[in-house]
Regions:
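N-terminal alpha-helical segment
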Residues: 8, 18, 73, 265, ...
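Single conserved hydrophobic/aromatic residue that forms the stacking wall/gate
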Residues: 1-12, 16
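Short, surface-exposed glycine/acidic/tryptophan-bearing loops
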Residues: 35, 55-56, 260, 264, ...
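Sequence context surrounding c-type heme c attachment/ligation sites in exported
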Residues: 100-103, 118-261, 272, 279, ...
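A cross-family structural signal marking well-folded subdomains
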Residues: 13, 17-154, 165
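Structured segments of extracytoplasmic/periplasmic soluble domains
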Residues: 10-13, 24-29, 41-45, 76-83, ...
């Protein structure tokens, strides 16, 4: 949406006017441009668009489903923003934003129509929040099965704000066509990788954040219940143990809340300023993070605090 009024308010250094303008801009239908472009940059939704899911293996993954999976992410994020929900709703929510097409894809009953709508979900459905959405899960797969390393890197970079270690040179990817690998689960294959001295340190940090997603296949659907529960039970680099995505959500919200809060602030600043954050920005970032936390972690508070910060006004 146009920033002219916001810019004039900024020039006047009028905090109240800027905050009011934020509310107006968020309510404006043209805020869709912000939501889509920010989600594309922050969450790397483009990877979902680029991924060629094997439709012979996943016949329900039609081109209409593929399009709606990206729309789900946009609608969900916009709903959280416009309703001024907690930023932690982005991690875990008791609802999804879907239409009939996606409801049939996910296996969620009772949804009709093409419009995206708020649909309550129970824990047994294993949905809710960004990290169980098909756009992320399919976009970070190999088109058939889930890809734990891609998913781990995304979670560390986009959600926790960590920089994963780069792989050592000349280390081949896991080959799904290898007869030996075909007899092993992904968790077992990665365990073999960890036995290699050159791979051990990287995989010890990465694997736990990816293996929790082994409940979901390359299309973003739940794997059959026959999938070993042990594949999703992991020991985190911090020493804690989580089993599956539900416990990973709890871990992020309860134990890594500051990391997620800081990561989201940095990603939004990067988008708003059109540049990466640097060491010189750390003091201002810390102030935004502390203000956001003190005011209840509401999404609109995040935007208001950002646009009244020295970083934005310089």
């Amino acid at each position: 949406p146009p920033r002219s009024t916001l810019d004039r308010s900024s020039a006047a250094s009028d905090v109240y006017k800027r905050q009011s303008e934020v509310k107006r801009l968020i309510a404006d239908p043209r805020s869709w441009h912000f939501v889509r472009s920010f989600c594309d940059q922050w969450l790397k939704v483009y990877r979902h668009h680029e991924m060629q899911v094997d439709v012979t293996e996943h016949p329900s993954f039609t081109r209409f489903v593929k399009n709606d999976l990206a729309e789900e992410t946009y609608h969900f994020t916009r709903h959280v923003m416009q309703n001024n929900m907690s930023i932690f709703t982005l991690i875990d929510s008791d609802f999804v934003m879907i239409n009939q097409n996606l409801a049939e894809f996910y296996g969620i009953p009772g949804v009709q129509g093409t419009d995206f709508q708020v649909i309550p979900v129970s824990p047994e459905m294993k949905r809710g929040g960004l990290i169980t959405q098909g756009s992320f899960l399919s976009g970070h797969s190999d088109g058939n099965q889930g890809h734990p390393i891609k998913r781990a890197v995304w979670l560390m970079e986009r959600i926790l704000g960590e920089s994963p270690p780069p792989p050592p040179p000349n280390v081949p990817d896991l080959d799904p066509k290898d007869p030996v690998n075909q007899q092993l689960s992904i968790a077992q294959q990665l365990a073999i990788h960890r036995d290699s001295v050159s791979c051990r340190n990287c995989h010890k940090k990465l694997d736990p954040y990816g293996l929790v997603f082994e409940e979901y296949n390359g299309a973003g659907l739940l794997n059959p219940p026959t999938t070993s529960a042990q594949d999703t039970k992991v020991t985190l680099p911090t020493g804690g143990i989580v089993n599956g995505v539900a416990e990973m959500k709890d871990y992020i919200v309860q134990s890594r809340s500051r990391e997620f809060r800081t990561s989201l602030v940095k990603h939004l600043l990067t988008y708003a300023l059109g540049r990466d954050m640097s060491f010189a920005d750390e003091k201002d970032i810390k102030n935004i993070v502390e203000t956001l936390s003190a005011k209840g972690d509401r999404f609109q508070t995040l935007v208001e605090t950002l646009v009244t910060s020295p970083l934005f006004l310089r």
